[in-house]
Design a protein with these regions (language model features):
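A cross-family phosphate/adenosyl-ligand binding-site feature
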Residues: 1-120, 125-399
Length: 399
């Protein structure tokens, strides 16, 4: 989460979900945000302002006419200070006020004055949420560029079940970060492959590699955060699907070949970060192979070359990025792969470099481009490298 140096004005309104805003405040603060909490008077009936003051380190403001603040007109100073303005939970009442420009408390008055992006997280009874008036008000806010985080479904405090629950904190954090992030990939379709493949020897054993999928998942997550429509074709991993990403699970290289090639034509960027097995057992035993006294010899067959097939079928305007993991002759091998596979860009890294490779949160990479130039950034997090890769692809797409 990227909140360091950002001022988040968090508005808490009067619903039972107000208590969940305490965890949101804590997580924002832990991730480096300056959190300024505004509350409606009804919100203060559900949870004490002191809770938010303790968690944020700042005074929580309830009364528009509180005379204990410094000389600035507080709702104006907070409106100007905000990098993002968040209403969570947002009741039907405050949504209606926001849609119609009513400013009769600290929350709605400051909202009317801010020029920051606004995030609204509705939380209310299902009937109130589904009411056409509420839905019309939400559409009005969407039309004005507000970021609406849809409520979750489940058991509600009133005893009903349905839509209306305030989403979990991680979903709220993602929505807030997205509002803070430039949507420069909006309208782009991006396909990312990630993780290992598994090639079955028998019903128990398989051939695979050490890939965890972290790099590909980082790329998919950052692309979605920046507004792209993202498809992630993933081999078996223990990673959670990044929010906003459509994940397609596969197991073998042939599965990945089919999943990728069937979707390739619609993509603007294809980023093939998966560690795909080059070979598979020529035959897969129907029963578990039993241990004998001698050696076990397994004949291997070549898997289809997904990157090469994408390079052949690449349509005009489509950009193809491959990856190369090497243990020797890194740049020579990477340059050869870039040319042979008709890539526009290739990300090369060495398993020998400390801080690079499988299972690390960082990477050390050289970016090679079809026009011959290279870029060698210093060690960075995989999320930062993901953004760099996307930046370069976006730059090429605009030429």
């Amino acid at each position: 989460m990227r909140f360091a140096g950002k001022t988040v004005v968090l508005c808490v309104t009067g619903g039972i979900a107000a208590y969940k805003a305490a965890d949101l405040t804590s997580k924002l603060h832990q991730n480096g945000a300056e959190v300024r909490v505004l509350m409606t008077e009804s919100a203060a009936q559900f949870i004490s302002p002191m809770t938010f003051e303790t968690l944020s380190g700042n005074r929580a403001v309830v009364d528009t006419f509180d005379r204990s603040f410094p000389w600035e007109v507080e709702h104006i100073s907070l409106a100007k200070a905000a990098d993002v303005f968040v209403i969570a939970p947002a009741t039907a009442n405050v949504i209606a006020k926001a849609a119609h420009g009513i400013a009769d408390d600290m929350v709605t008055t400051t909202l009317l004055a801010t020029k920051a992006p606004v995030v609204v997280a509705p939380a209310m009874n299902t009937g109130m949420y589904d009411n056409p008036v509420t839905q019309s008000n939400l559409e009005t806010l969407r039309g004005r560029g507000f970021h609406i985080i849809d409520p979750a479904a489940g058991h509600l405090a009133c005893g009903d079940s349905g839509r209306g629950k305030l989403p979990d904190t991680q979903t709220l954090l993602w929505g807030i970060e997205k509002a803070l992030t430039g949507q420069d990939l909006a309208g782009k379709h991006v396909l990312v492959t990630a993780g290992p493949t598994q090639e079955a020897m028998d019903p128990v054993r398989f051939l695979s590699n050490h890939s965890t999928g972290q790099m590909g998942y980082a790329i998919a997550g950052r692309a979605a955060m920046r507004g792209a429509e993202v498809t992630l074709v993933s081999g078996p991993t223990a990673l959670d699907t990044p929010k906003g990403v459509n994940r397609v699970d596969i197991r073998s290289a042939r599965d990945m070949y089919d999943a990728v090639l069937s979707r390739a034509a619609q993509q603007d960027f294809i980023i093939k970060a998966a560690a795909v097995g080059d070979y598979r057992p020529a035959e897969t035993a129907d029963e578990k192979l039993k241990k004998g006294d001698g050696e076990l010899n397994i004949r291997l067959a070549r898997n289809p070359d997904i990157l090469a097939a994408l390079g052949v079928d690449k349509r005009p305007g489509q950009l193809l990025c491959g990856f190369a993991m090497e243990t020797q002759n890194l740049l020579d091998n990477a340059e050869s792969k870039l040319r042979r596979k008709n890539c526009d860009m290739l990300v090369a890294n060495s398993l020998r470099d400390k801080g690079a490779g499988f299972g690390t949160d960082t990477n050390i990479a050289t970016l090679l481009f079809a026009d011959g130039h290279r870029e060698q950034p210093s060690i960075m997090s995989k999320a930062d490298l993901a953004d760099l890769i996307l930046d370069r692809l976006l730059g090429m797409s605009r030429r």
